[in-house]
Amino acid sequence: MRIYNSATHKKEEFQPIESGKVRMYVCGPTVYDNIHIGNARTFISFDVIRRWLIASGYEVTFAQNLTDVDDKIIKRANEQGRTAAEVATEFSDKFIGVMRAANVLDPDVRPRATKEIGPMIAMIKTLIEQGHAYAADNGDVYFAVRSDPNYGQVSGRNIDDLMVGARIEENEDKNDPLDFALWKAAKPGEPSWPSPWGEGRPGWHTECAAMVHRYLGTPIDIHGGGSDLAFPHHENECAQATCAWHQGFSSTWMHTGMLLVDGEKMSKSLGNFFTLAEVLEQHSAAALRLLMLQTSYRSPLDFSWERLEGAENSLTRIAGTVENLRWAANHATADADEAASEAFAAKAAETRATFKECMDDDFNTAGAMGAVFGFVTECNQYLEQAGDAADKAAALAAADTLVELLDTFGVELPEPKVELPLGLLGVAAGLVAYTGDDVDEAAAKILEARAEARAAKNWDLADAIRDQLKDLGLTIEDTAAGTRIKTL
């Protein structure tokens, strides 16, 4: 397996620190509002990556934090006349709920910043003791960026270049404009905790570094997030961790690309800003995931409602193929062609191999989905050629292949509507004098009568059958593998 490392700008052979085990951390949200689909793109991408690592046999420990104390949370609380804790609790719950609605697996560990103040203070004390941080007279504590000779290793930025044309907040309490806050002195009305430097709260970058170390240990195998976090957040995380504990922070850094809407940056002012909850009210989680899978996680993703509708249609097509394969397997009336069956079975094995090859190449979901779509076409061609002589084992194996590969991605196919109503017994009694109580047998008798009526050009009877079925919410579908009654 090869993974693109954002820090080295190249694909590298993935070698976990501990054989067979992967420790993985992805930065969670600052919980002051509902997450938008750009945020969701990152979380869904890493959910797919995590699922593939698990499918590949790794024992994955996945941690994701909730930043529940931050300037944005405090600002929102003040605007609404609420406490920061109330705002954070509301949007933490909403985040967890919408992630589950999007079929994103819960993390193994979900630490909340406000519950981890002790480890953060301990890390800051260590940094001060080792000369990498200092306390200002006003109660703030800052990381001394120039004390870290490796600063810039995550983002590839040079310290001197950062000073050229950079928008750096002037702060007379800092020794250097590049230094960043590890601890912020308390302000009136803001949440705070006691510390050796007085009442205050942790800086954002401090939170993740301390939580990674506490719950996963360092170094970890994979640290991920959106590309906008590479600098300064991930750079500053890494600087603190490596200076505090004198070991690597993450073997591999992974970052997802930006999400665009109809080719433009998402913005409330442009009217193209959508929350994940809003999207899931109109479309399935599977369709949204399928849309995202068709672009590399590292590349910009262009979202549009038309593309999302197209993804829904693709799901319906795949689900229909799976349904047709299973139906053909259970309703074949002639002997299957052995050579054709073997060739078809080989196509399924080839699809699985191509899928794995793509996913092992930096999680190339676009290539993997290309293999799936190609196999769907081959399945439909096989059914058309086989007619009523489909090979049961090969057809069922093909259906399982499609379902299992998509399940690896967390894509659930829509359930086919196959349960026939008891009212069909009455239709069969009136049309073909059927007196039994087996709905499936009644359906078969009706189809026989329709076939005979069409052969005899008795269009009145054929139309009567169609109309009475329609009244029950049913229709007759003619496929290459045969004819069946299904729900509308």
PLM features: residue spans?
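Alpha-helix C-terminal capping/helix-coil junction sites
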Residues: 54, 100, 128-129, 254, ...
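N-terminal, positively charged nucleic-acid-binding surface of large information/translation enzymes
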Residues: 8-11, 17-105, 482-485
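Alpha-helical recognition segments enriched in aromatics with Gly/Pro capping
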Residues: 1-32, 47, 118-328
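Short, glycine/charge-rich beta-strand/loop segments that flank catalytic centers
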Residues: 66-71, 92-95, 105-120, 138-147
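Structural preference for alpha-helix termini/caps and helix-kink/transition segments
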Residues: 275-488
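Short Gly/Ser/Thr- and Asp/Glu-enriched loop/turn motifs at secondary-structure junctions
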Residues: 106, 136-138, 478-482
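The substrate-binding groove and active-site-proximal loops of carbohydrate-active enzymes
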Residues: 77-84, 108-114, 198, 226
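Short phosphate-binding/catalytic loops that engage adenosine nucleotides
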Residues: 58, 132, 474
